[in-house]
């Protein structure tokens, strides 16, 4: 069993923020792979399903970004999962918009959701980094991250989310390189 976590902030006012792209990814995966109904558990929203041959739990912490680790830690302990079962989808400033990279472990790069998970569980988890691009100057980062995707970005966002969901079976079976490559190819074809 794997636990896939999407990072974001709860509430409709945050739904289209770049910071919520982790939530968006999980919503798309759940829809494409016909996951079960949403259950309120572990201080978040949980859905159960299968991706390929793997049982996968999708968790969107409802704790706000800065406390995501509480929710994730609770689920990990309940299901007695090791760190190798955890995959976290999050926004990444240091990647070009709509690029997808998978990384094992590492630092938090100032991301409060990652920092919270690291604090509660340690840094050794798989991250699916979803590029939102950098606004160019550090003074503009907060507004960029907490801003909505622009209308002009919607097609690229939908393409990225669809590619992630379509290729999710590769991620579930641990073929991270092919997962990334196939997403990039789908995006080239769509663009």
Swiss-Prot record:
UniProt keyword annotations, A-Z: Cytoplasm, Hydrolase, RNA-binding, tRNA-binding
Active site positions, chain numbering: 19 (proton acceptor)
Binding-site residues for tRNA, renumbered to this chain: 14, 64, 66, 112
A GO molecular function held by the record: tRNA binding
EC main group: hydrolase
Catalysed transformations (reactions): an N-acyl-L-alpha-aminoacyl-tRNA + H2O = an N-acyl-L-amino acid + a tRNA + H(+)
Residue numbers marked as site, Stabilizes the basic form of H active site to accept a proton: 91
Residues with site note (Discriminates between blocked and unblocked aminoacyl-tRNA): 9
Enzyme Commission number(s) from the entry: 3.1.1.29
Keyword Plastid tagged: no
Protein location: Cytoplasm
Subunit structure: Monomer.
Family: Belongs to the PTH family.
Protein name listed in UniProt: Peptidyl-tRNA hydrolase
Species of origin: Novosphingobium aromaticivorans (strain ATCC 700278 / DSM 12444 / CCUG 56034 / CIP 105152 / NBRC 16084 / F199)
Gene this chain is encoded by: pth
């Amino acid at each position: 069993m794997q636990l896939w976590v999407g990072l974001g902030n709860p509430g409709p006012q945050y739904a289209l923020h770049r910071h919520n792209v982790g939530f968006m990814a999980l919503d798309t995966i759940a829809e494409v792979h016909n996951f079960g109904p949403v259950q309120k558990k572990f201080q978040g929203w949980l859905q159960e399903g299968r991706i390929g041959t793997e049982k996968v739990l999708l968790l969107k912490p409802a704790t706000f970004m800065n406390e995501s680790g509480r929710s994730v830690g609770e689920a990990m302990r309940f299901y007695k999962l090791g760190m190798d079962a955890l995959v976290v989808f999050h926004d990444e400033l240091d990647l070009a918009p709509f690029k997808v990279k998978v990384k094992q472990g590492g630092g938090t790069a100032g991301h409060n959701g990652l920092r919270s998970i690291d604090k509660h569980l340690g840094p050794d988890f798989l991250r699916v980094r979803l590029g939102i691009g950098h606004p160019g100057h550090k003074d503009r980062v907060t507004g960029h991250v907490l801003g909505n995707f622009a209308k002009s970005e919607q097609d690229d966002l939908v393409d990225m989310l669809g590619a992630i969901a379509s290729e999710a079976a590769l991620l579930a079976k641990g073929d991270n390189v092919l997962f990334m490559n196939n997403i990039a190819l789908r995006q080239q074809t769509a663009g």
